[in-house]
């Protein structure tokens, strides 16, 4: 028997990431090749014509799984009964804009969206915040939606995770799919800490294979952390297709499970690994039955603790910067 369609809300639908994302969702890459979807697309009033153009293209693909499309500039329409919400749209940093101003501008957007989700979304909605600063935006949305379970709100660390995987694959000369138990701690920012101390390839330790702390500290971590800036430098535009791909990976694994594989998700802490509760933090997780679970019992050495503290301090500063807006 055919499955009932799932409602997928996407904000910033007319943007670059949206354009890379929507066709793959409609093709079944995110929720499975047997799962019909209804896309509920949100963007600003001035972007509605552009969204209509994207929808014309979606129609022209004749995707068998695309059961319907809603176009709106009203969050309460976009999030109505949503099973999955991808919050992609965010205020980008303009020239001369202080980080504080960026945080405040986005806090307003994500407060409104959190409240709308709280009012109209499915009680089981899975929310992924892609728009930057993703961790803090996810925290704001979560805090603005008190009637939804806090674990329904997540931030995207999967792009950092995938970037780190590809760097390790290149360094070891091994296929990217053979690398297991590599993950990322912290904020989706250059302070994130990609950790391969437990990673293996075909059962062999990646740390032993690479055996180069200088490469780890001076090449690997900066390359992964500043990859977004390097892409803007090279392409003149920010990474859109790779961000969309990471969003697909994140939701796919959350909904359909990881089969024991460890991945990275930004999730609200319950105090695990000494991270203050409610902090939206990148953790190693496994997913099964539509739920994620933090990998427990990992030893944190002094170097790793130092790196985790740096990214945590940045997140705490961001959180403090928006606290007054949350009432």
UniProtKB/Swiss-Prot annotation:
Keywords: NAD, Oxidoreductase, Tricarboxylic acid cycle. The active site is at residue 188. NAD(+) binds at residues 12-18, 106, 113, 130-132. The keyword Oxidoreductase applies. Pfam families: Ldh_1_C, Ldh_1_N. NCBIfam families: MalateDH-SF1, PRK05442.1. This is Malate dehydrogenase. It comes from Cupriavidus pinatubonensis (strain JMP 134 / LMG 1197).
